[in-house]
Amino acid sequence: MKKLLSILAVFGVSAVGTTSVVACNKTESNNLSIVKTIAVPATVATANPKQVTNAEIKTALEANVLKAVQGVVKTATAADFQFDVYQDNKGTSLTTINLEEGNVEVYVQITPAKDKTVVIGETGYIKVTLPKIKVDISGVVIDQQIVEIKAADPKQVTKDELNAVNTYATLASAVLEAIKNKAPNAGASDFEITNNCDAGDYSAQKDVKVTVKAKDESPNISGEFKVNAKVKATLAPPKAG
């Protein structure tokens, strides 16, 4: 009997020990250490893309950090936690970064707000790659352009013939120069030109609006602007043969 009790005692101690270990290793459901990723913001609003401040970065990240915390505690609000942004995963302070030349990696750590217990613990240093800032071209202004295209009949110019307005060399050159003055890294492949021309009589100059729009996939620019143009069609030479 003593042997049996001894065996049971041994198993009892072992069971208690195992339970204790499990309890120590269990992560509470509201522990911020559960957060491993933070979504990247579409852009970072800044006064100077070459010197994006810590405060501007935090503003850009606020909504996505909140979503990450709410993945731990659904009812959490921005008042329940605080976060900061660092240069690396060692907590080196960050003052400014340059987002004009390319993407930049920063590290975010989230901790509970003072005297708040909705969330506990803290995250590690979570890497977030901030996207290169696209220059907004919506403020670009270009002088009125004179555009001359060829048509089979200048009095009955078709929509297809009017597409030549979009690639007219002088217009395209003026647009590119104006954009590069604001966004030096931009090129002709970053934007597209369209017009509001209706088919009809262009034997005399006609006022039209040309739209210059940054392509969605452009890594350098965003936005669009309008250009006033006077379009005239002249008779196209007859096709050979």
UniProtKB/Swiss-Prot annotation:
Domain of life: Bacteria
A Gene Ontology cellular-component term: plasma membrane
Keywords for the protein's UniProt record, in alphabetical order: Cell membrane, Lipoprotein, Membrane, Palmitate, Signal
PTMs per UniProt: Palmitate and stearate are the major lipid components.
Leader sequence residues: 1-23
InterPro entries tied to this protein: Lipoprotein_mollicutes-type_CS, Spiralin
Lipidation (S-diacylglycerol cysteine): C24
Residues carrying lipid (N-palmitoyl cysteine): C24
Subcellular location as annotated: Cell membrane
Membrane topology: Lipid-anchor
Main localization of the protein described in the UniProt heading: membrane
Assembly and oligomerization: Seems to occur as dimer, tetramers, and large oligomers of identical chains.
Task performed by this protein: Major membrane protein of spiroplasma.
Recorded family membership: Belongs to the spiralin family.
Protein name (Swiss-Prot/TrEMBL): Spiralin
Name of the encoding gene: spi
